Amino acid sequence: MEFSPPLQRATLIQRYKRFLADVITPDGRELTLHCPNTGAMTGCATPGDTVWYSTSDNTKRKYPHTWELTQSQSGAFICVNTLWANRLTKEAILNESISELSGYSSLKSEVKYGAEHSRIDFMLQADSRPDCYIEVKSVTLAENEQGYFPDAVTERGQKHLRELMSVAAEGQRAVIFFAVLHSAITRFSPARHIDEKYAQLLSEAQQRGVEILAYKAELSAEGMALKKSLPVTL
């Protein structure tokens, strides 16, 4: 996926009110960007980081600029727009870049399912194969090349794991897919030090037949794509 039109560069002053960030452009203008990420954004929003942003042609938007990527002061690229995790995963599935998810003839998005009234990110179908339910999570928290999810306690994420276990128990295929959107990450684990319950549920889910996949995106200011499978340690 290529960014079109090209992203523009600025330097981060501060992120605040969760949804806003002030930046300064190379020519000295101060802008307020929309921040499409409600998470903690640990390590992704340090003042002085380079920010890459898009600009909407919708004249009715109060904040027409959207923060898409961070380029940290160590040089790592991080996709902070959480919407891209699903978009990149869908693109990779359709391009058959994810070998574990290839060979299906139909892809549906946001399908209602489960006893807890959830919506699955993607459902894959094919003749003579069980349906494949895929829940996507964006991974941007990094420490010494180790990627972690979540970056804050997530009751919603815990619910999704319970739903996937129910799907697997019914004989369908259930997949939790971690889209790693940080160029410095080389391996993945659940963030037990942040959400122990989620880590416990992820281990239980694997034991009950839920598949765990982690794929890393190649990231740059020009574009990004999920390319490489990463090792997962529970």
Swiss-Prot record:
Coiled coil ranges: none
Domain of life: Bacteria
Keywords: DNA-binding
DNA-binding region extent: 201-220
GO MF annotation terms: DNA binding
UniProt function note: Binds to DNA non-specifically. Could be a regulatory factor involved in maltose metabolism.
HAMAP family associated with the record: SfsA
Family that this chain belongs to: Belongs to the SfsA family.
Protein name listed in UniProt: Sugar fermentation stimulation protein A
Species of origin: Escherichia coli O7:K1 (strain IAI39 / ExPEC)
Upper lineage: Bacteria, Pseudomonadati, Pseudomonadota, Gammaproteobacteria, Enterobacterales
